[in-house]
Amino acid sequence: MGTEKKLKKNQNKKINSFISPMLARQTDKPFDDNNWIFEIKWNGYRAISEIKANTVTIYSRNGKKLNDRYPAIATALKKLNHDALIDGEIVVLDKDGKSDFKKLQEYDNGSGANLCFYAFDLLSLNGRNITHLPLLQR
């Protein structure tokens, strides 16, 4: 089934409850496979960001709200001007662009640390559940 048909078939299916993000899997040795997508391990906090009617709620992978801890991320996500559910990771980058988990744990909103939200996946857009589409199309 083509992408357009999949979108039309599933356009009214909504995501109505908290979604636990997929987590990385540890392996015994490195491998390469064209059927897999490889991503950087950022060493941050996994987060699901829900943007709805110009309101943003950021959840940890366990469902804890993170808005109070990372208001700059919520403010930035509001600027998207779309309703969306985004899976990503909150990190603090050091001067070399590497994630620093210790600095993330110590993060204070006024600290000037380089706080970022790296999006991995778009789960819904403007009320449409798009999880049925292949990751590379989302």
Q: What positions do the PLM features span?
A:
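Catalytic cores of nucleic-acid ligases and guanylyltransferases
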Residues: 1-138
